[in-house]
Amino acid sequence: MTRVLGIDPGSRVTGYGILDWTGKPVLVAAGCIRTETDDFPERLRRIFEGISRIVEEFRPEEMAVEQVFMHKNADSALKLGQARGAAICAGVAHGLPVHEYAARQVKLALVGKGSADKAQVQHMVCFLLGQAGPLALDASDALGVAFCHLHHRQTLSRMSRMVRR
């Protein structure tokens, strides 16, 4: 069994999702870390501590994080990058290997279309997990990152077995 923590970073809301892989994906936990303050360094601390608590509680083996895409607003891109850095530091501080995926790569792995919108990602995550009701958008995005990583791991594993033959 492999347990993966997926992260959808944000400076105000950071989504997280944890999946176990036992031959099929199993939802362990999903939610959002809401920083709820205007003080930016405090937001980063809350992201770091929130991810740390999640790692300590659920003990994932690997972490997958969505990469920053270029914003039209440079300040927003910088803040997003710093929030992402806080999440990555929390994972690394707990000894997790961290894997990064572009948003387009995540959407392509889940929906089959790199330009899919958040609602399409949310729908596919719920469908794949057999969820009746929708998850929060940030949480479903984080689960999408975890799905993408599991898919990537499976592909590499299959290729490795083929090469050894």
From Swiss-Prot:
Residues of the active site: D8, E66, D138
Single Gene Ontology BP annotation: DNA repair
Subcellular localization: Cytoplasm
InterPro entries: RNaseH-like_sf, RNaseH_sf, X-over_junc_endoDNase_Mg_BS, X-over_junc_endoDNase_RuvC
Reaction(s) this enzyme catalyzes, per UniProt: Endonucleolytic cleavage at a junction such as a reciprocal single-stranded crossover between two homologous DNA duplexes (Holliday junction)
Taxonomy, superkingdom: Bacteria
Similarity-based family: Belongs to the RuvC family.
Identification of the protein by name: Crossover junction endodeoxyribonuclease RuvC
Species of provenance: Methylococcus capsulatus (strain ATCC 33009 / NCIMB 11132 / Bath)
